[in-house]
Amino acid sequence: MEEDLLRRAADLAERCERTATVTSTAFLTPAEQYALTNWARHRDCTLVLHGGGEGCERRAAFFLPFYLTAEDFDPAEHLRAVHFSAPFGAPGHRDYLGAILGLGIRREWVGDILVQDHGAYVFCLPSVAPALLELEQVGRTGVKAAAAE
């Protein structure tokens, strides 16, 4: 598994350098982040990990082109957040994750799921956000989804 990740990272770093555009992985587990960070230390590339919010456990890795510093990088251009409100119930993390995976969305396309009273924030890749916005039920609870700012 780690070998596949590092091979993919090498491809993304090379594409970033060749095209001078930001490239990124899907969301990574903490172990994958550790392996990738160690790999990047021995390469001539700028790697930034971001999960969409402060303190996120699952984060995507972004390879930055020569003209972009980590301080200038805006992850909001490459990640999305969807807010779910559940006024008549309080679904848990497992309920949200089950509903999302039930849509056919792979786990690595979704970052952290921050459950709050009567709602949750879900960080995801931009390609997944439209499907999440269509979600109307989590567990046995009706929900309303909206793009978070």
Regions inferred by a protein language model and the residue ranges of each:
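Non-catalytic terminal extensions of ATP-dependent helicases
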Residues: 1-149
